[in-house]
A protein has these predicted regions:
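Extended, histidine- and acidic-residue-enriched regions that form the cofactor-binding/catalytic faces
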Residues: 1-95, 99-115, 121-276
């Protein structure tokens, strides 16, 4: 299986092919995640791999509905403020991440792409706030960029009302939940199942099935999100959840729901822009 993070992206296209896509008024999906520890059973590229899978499937759905779409090479030098106490969690300063991301988006804009959508499945709030602030700033300067995320994320970040460049995606917790017996938010049942479905060769299945669920409570989250040694003390093996609860059938349903929800929001955004 091809495990390249450049699979299906512009990195595999020639420049005339990219120019042709621009002439076809193609939309651009920009995968934005990180390289981060995901316990002893998952690879550090988990967020990037899964974001890439989602982007390719969204692209395919959009193209089936007649909307030309390309995927930009992934941006994976972001912020890991919770897992920064672990080896393998690359984290850069907010200013560095913003500067690099701005210039990447400015490149796409200058070439003539009229719709640029950021897609990220990295749940670090400092990372997500950096994305939102970057997109809002660029959008204020007429950049055709937008950031899609679960609507609950924008609510927790305090964006109300939402600017047009922040696109909320409605995902029901009941629909996308796999593990319900414990807090499962990092390298647990959800991500382990998803990686087992899409990149089984990158999952240490024997290790995953031997791991015990973490016992964090809501009152522990305040300490956990501080990162560094505080987070590592609570989750010394680098996961928060139940990795042994691998459910391939359920994660397929979750993936389909995520693809549908994101695709629908992009199409609505494109139709709104066309009508303006």
């Amino acid at each position: 299986m091809n495990t390249s993070v450049f699979k299906g992206t512009m990195a595999e296209m020639s420049y005339p092919q990219i120019e042709a896509a621009i002439q076809q008024q193609a939309a651009v999906l920009l995968p934005v995640s990180v390289i981060e520890e995901h316990g002893p059973h998952l690879c550090t590229g988990t967020d990037m791999y899964l974001t890439g899978v989602v982007c390719r499937k969204i692209r395919d759905e959009l193209q089936q509905q007649g909307k030309s779409t390309v995927i930009a090479p992934p941006f994976y030098w972001g912020i890991n403020s919770i897992t920064d106490g672990f080896t393998g969690s690359f984290s850069i300063r907010k200013e560095t991440a913003q500067a690099l991301l701005k210039e990447i988006i400015e490149n796409l804009d200058s070439w003539g792409f009229q719709h640029i959508f950021l897609v990220s499945f990295h749940g670090d709030f400092r990372h997500m706030r950096m994305l939102a602030e970057t997109v809002i700033e660029l959008h204020s300067k007429s950049s055709p960029v937008a950031y899609l995320a679960d609507q609950s994320i924008f609510q927790q970040l305090g964006y109300a009302p939402l600017p047009d460049c922040l696109i909320p995606v409605s995902l029901s917790p009941d629909t996308i939940a796999i593990e319900t017996s414990c807090i499962d938010i990092h390298a647990g049942a959800m991500e382990t199942s998803w990686m087992a479905l899409q990149y089984e060769q990158l999952v240490d299945m024997e290790c995953a099935k031997a791991l015990q669920p973490t016992q964090l409570k809501l009152c522990d989250m305040k300490q956990w999100i501080q990162g560094g040694s505080s987070a590592k003390q609570l989750t010394p093996l680098g996961y928060c959840g139940n990795p042994a609860n691998i459910q391939l059938d359920k994660i397929q349903q979750v993936e389909q729901e995520v693809i549908r929800a994101y695709t629908d929001q992009i199409l609505m955004n494109l139709m709104k822009a066309a009508a303006a």
